[in-house]
Amino acid sequence: VEIEEELEIEDTETDEDEIVEIEEEDDDEIFIVVENMPLFPGCSDEGCTQSNILRHISRNFKYPPMLKDYGIEGRVIATFVVNKKGKASDVQILRGLDKKIDDEVVRVIKSLPVFTPGKQRNKPASVRYTVPIYVQLQ
């Protein structure tokens, strides 16, 4: 097997009159950790925020009635972004159980209250969270 590689190098020199644009930092960057993490309403630290996210999900999750006969239980792993305005967005299921259960997890996460946004370098920043959710039929 022969592989041909062709490398093309473009001229990077500029003329004196040429205007060079410098790209600004990406404003839509999503962080995992920032200097000041988002805060759940009424919280002053990250531990309180984590507890309240899980409490909100637990209290507001409604097991889909049509699945009760099947007794589907287990862990759903979801990820979402607390955006610069403090809203939960970009909810995705990384590991699901059933479409109806996964849809309910997405609904509940989207219903999270507005957070105090996270900050990086004193500017609002979007922060991604990943949460394991244990679904049990009760």
PLM features: what roles do these ranges have?
Residues 1-138:
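Charge-biased low-complexity segments
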